[in-house]
């Protein structure tokens, strides 16, 4: 198979440098990526740590007006402590304080491995009403630490750099929990601040955490 060598300066990104782009068959080889395309910004793999933080301007993290929508993916999140919770909080001072006031709702579905107790329920104890503490991303006290147990899911954060509007977010997680149940949790709400959110922290309510979290920007 013949190989063709391209010089580095044969790729002209100038026409689309301010947008997402992809290769095509045109002379300059590039085209603007369609809206909704995702750009991987940062991958963090936690190993028995207290928290995972994404701070704008630190370690190549982008969390500003570059994107209107950001996506966090949770992969193989495993706690060191049994029957704990994965949580999130936000900062407006690049992580000096994680105490943004939040309004949220929370409901979940579940089914035991023995095919009992299938249910959908609103969990009032897991929502926040102008609370500044951690927001649960799974039902309280249920994240399992057995070798075969973990949590996965995602969270969207919308327009965090706005200094006009509150900051909406929504999350879905699925876990094999400490009670050997398949449990899915749905969280939605907003950070009730018109200051720009420039840092996000994920942690367990008790003990350390393991797993991988990926941050993506969604092309406007």
Question: Can you describe what each PLM-predicted range is?
Answer:
Residues 2-220:
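Surface-exposed molecular-recognition determinants
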């Amino acid at each position: 198979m013949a190989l063709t060598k391209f010089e580095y300066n044969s790729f002209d990104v100038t026409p689309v440098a301010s947008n997402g782009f992809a290769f095509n068959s045109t002379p300059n080889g590039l085209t603007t990526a369609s809206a909704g395309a995702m750009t991987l910004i940062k991958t963090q793999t936690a190993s028995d740590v207290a928290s995972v933080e994404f701070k704008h301007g630190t370690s190549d993290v982008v969390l500003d007006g570059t994107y209107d929508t950001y996506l966090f993916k949770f992969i193989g999140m495993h706690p060191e402590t049994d029957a704990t919770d994965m949580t999130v909080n936000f900062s407006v001072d690049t992580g000096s304080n994680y105490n943004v006031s939040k309004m949220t709702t929370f409901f979940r579905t579940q089914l035991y491995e023995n095919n009992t107790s299938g249910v959908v329920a609103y969990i009032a104890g897991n929502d926040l009403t102008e609370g500044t503490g951690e927001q649960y991303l799974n039902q309280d006290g249920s994240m399992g630490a057995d070798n075969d147990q973990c949590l996965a899911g995602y969270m969207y954060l919308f327009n965090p750099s706005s200094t006009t509007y509150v900051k909406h977010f929504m999350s879905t997680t699925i876990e094999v929990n400490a009670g050997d149940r398949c449990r899915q949790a749905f969280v939605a709400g907003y950070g009730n601040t018109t200051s720009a959110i420039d840092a996000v922290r994920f942690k367990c309510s008790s003990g350390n955490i393991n797993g991988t979290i990926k941050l993506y920007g969604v092309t406007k």
